[in-house]
Amino acid sequence: MTMAKTLSSQTLKKNDNAPSFRLKGIDDKFYSIEDFKSKCLLIVFICNHCPYVKARIGDLVDLQSKFSNSQLQIVGINSNDPAYQDEGFENMIKFSNENNLNFPYLIDDSQQVAKSYGAVCTPDPFLFEENRKLVFHGKINDALEPEMTPQIHVMENNVKSVLDGQTLEKDFDPSIGCSIKWKTDP
C-alpha cells in the first residue's frame, strides 16, 4: 500500500452552494444536506487508512464537541474505493468506534459526491455557512505532516469567525493528505 501525498484543489469557490447528496451512514440511515440545520456545516472527506486522517481525526472529534449541533455539524464522507485495503462500510464502522466519532460518517461508494465537491485528498474539508454557501475549503490546522503538532487550529478559528458573523481572511488554504482512492474504469 502506497501513500500519495496530495494537496486539495479548488473546484468549489467561495459562495458556491453545497452540492446535494443522499448517502448512507454507518448507522444505516440515509442523510442529505437538508438534514443538517446547524449554522455551520463542515463536510470532510476522510477515510480509514490514511495517516493524515488518523492524525487529525481527534481534532475533528474535539471540534464537534466544542460546539453545539445547532452551531456546527461535522459530516465525514468516505469516497475511497470500498475495495481498497482497510476501506469499505464495515471498516468505516470499526474506524468510527475506534476513534469515538461524534458525527455522521457516510459512504460515497459511487464517488460522485467527491467529484461534485472537487475533493481529491483525505482529509479534504469544506466549511459552509447557514445558507450552505461555501466560506472555506482547506486545512483543519497548520500541521503539514501527520507527526507534527498543530500550532494554529485553522478550522476552529474559521468556525468561530463564521458564527460571529465575520468574513474570513482566506477562503482557500489547501489541505494535505492521501489521495482519494478512485475506482478504476472497467
Predicted features, each with a name:
Residues 1-163, 167-172, 179-186:
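Chalcogenol-based redox active-site neighborhoods
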